[in-house]
A protein has these predicted regions:
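Hard-cation-handling environments
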Residues: 175-206, 233-245, 249-250
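Divalent metal-coordination and catalytic microenvironments
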Residues: 2, 23, 27, 61, ...
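His/Asp/Glu-enriched, well-ordered alpha-helical/loop segment
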Residues: 140-166, 236-237, 242-243, 248-289
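N-terminal small/glycine-rich loop or linker at the start of catalytic domains
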Residues: 1-6, 204-216
Length: 289
């Protein structure tokens, strides 16, 4: 599972030590940690810091290095050096790669050292200032919506680039029915593509929104019941490779506020197995992958 701890920079959210303890108690033998810290994990020293902080932990920690310097989406980070220091993949956590050529070059370059590139499935120009799924509920509640199209366009672009460049690409936390279909077709073509789904997208929908509970403000947003059913089918059929907790604790000052002002993110390590097991036969999932 991929997680976001606060250290370094946001220790008030969660330290590495506490996060690893929670992961171990929740049954995880290994986790991948995102680069969304301060400073961002975009160099070998930062990768080594994370590994050194976890040497005696029961749960193994695998760092995901930032794809770009400072996760700003402009200049590529030190991918090779981070890989040599222990980074298992490269991603600007929950930030789309807007520059098409940047992703193209990253996919080409990473092939030199068997690197794995993540591309977050969101087209910002389509998503705009949306904060929830665009649909009946967003209209009824007067909340700005994010069209599912924002996810589909980004994934389609990524797949075209991957077909051109070769290499390995991972699409994290897909959230729609059409995304499952797009990746299914790409796998049929033989592209080296994997994807994940956040556990909460398997059992929560945008029907939770009328209470304006900021715990349900996540990125990608909660979608429809039809999407949830398709995601579950994607898991059991093997199209979706990973179920992730997308554990991202937010401090109370930034979460217990007006819905539109709250930061995206929710905790997920403690509840993940029980929640997933309530909607998916885990034996069936293991056999599928």
């Amino acid at each position: 599972t991929s997680v976001s701890f606060g250290e370094p920079g946001f220790e008030e959210r969660e330290t590495i030590k506490n996060g690893l303890n929670v992961a171990a108690k929740s049954g995880f033998t290994a986790i991948a940690i995102n680069a969304n810290t301060s400073p961002v994990v975009d160099n070998k020293s930062a990768v080594e810091f994370l590994i050194n902080k976890s040497v005696n932990a029961a749960t193994t920690l695998y760092p995901i290095g930032a794809l770009t310097q400072g996760s700003k989406g402009i200049d590529m980070a030190e991918l090779y050096d981070m890989k040599q220091s222990g980074a298992v993949a490269f991603a600007d956590y929950n930030k789309p790669i807007a520059n098409d050529n940047l992703l193209k070059v990253a996919l080409q370059y990473a092939q030199n050292f068997d690197g794995l590139i993540f591309s977050f499935p969101k087209n910002n120009s389509i998503a705009g200032e949306g904060i929830v799924n665009e649909g009946v509920n967003s209209t009824r509640l007067g909340l700005k919506g994010i069209p599912a199209l924002a996810e589909h366009l980004q994934i389609a672009r990524d797949l075209f680039l991957l077909e051109y460049t070769g290499g390995k690409l991972h699409i994290p936390t897909i959230s729609t029915k059409k995304s499952v279909l797009l990746i299914k077709e790409a796998k049929k073509k033989g592209l080296d593509i994997t994807c994940s789904v956040a556990a909460h997208h398997l059992f929560l929908t945008d029907d939770e929104l009328p209470d304006f509970d900021s715990r349900y403000k996540v990125n990608p947003p909660l979608r429809t019941n039809e999407d949830t059913k398709a995601l579950i089918k994607g898991v059991t059929s093997g199209v979706i490779d990973i179920i992730t907790s997308d554990h991202n604790p937010i401090d109370i000052e930034n979460k217990k506020v007006e819905f539109s002002e709250a930061k995206d993110g929710t905790i997920g390590l403690e509840s993940m197995f029980g929640a997933v097991n309530s909607v998916i036969n885990t034996t069936e999932f293991i056999e599928a992958i």
